Amino acid sequence: MRHWNLSVKYLLLLAAQVLVWNYFNFTPLLTVTILPVMILCLPLGCSVSMSLVIAFASGFAADFLVAGPTGLTILALVPVTFLRRPLLSMVFGSELLARGDEVSSRRLGRTKMLIAITLSTALFLLIYITADSAGTSPLWAMAVKFAASLALSSAISLPIADLLCPDTEARWK
């Protein structure tokens, strides 16, 4: 039941991401993304290969439904997915993966969750903005876009992490 609930939330958030990219493009110096936190909050029982397939499908759906270069979101999202477990281990410690706990900002701490979200979003945006610019934008414009997008996307992603990773289990197993 939990995975069904997570699947519905994931698809609704993917649709919200597509709507934001299509209809709320305020300035060319801002890219709002919630895809990295969606990947970060996948269950830890999900294998790396299944996570990569989910990331590829999510990126493909976002690229296909958004008026932009096809493959750009896939290019940026797959490395985030590939580095998800090492990132979680680096931020939360290896005991999270050893115990088989799920990611939860309430149980593991909102500060640590914000650090993990910021790191995954930074990796996504670094690849996305660099590939999107492709040498056509000056470095200052790319840096401003990266900083503004990282700040806004990380702030938006923290409540989304609470939505995707509810603390429904006991504190300790």
Task: Describe the residue ranges of each PLM region.
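Terminal, non-globular segments
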Residues: M1-K173
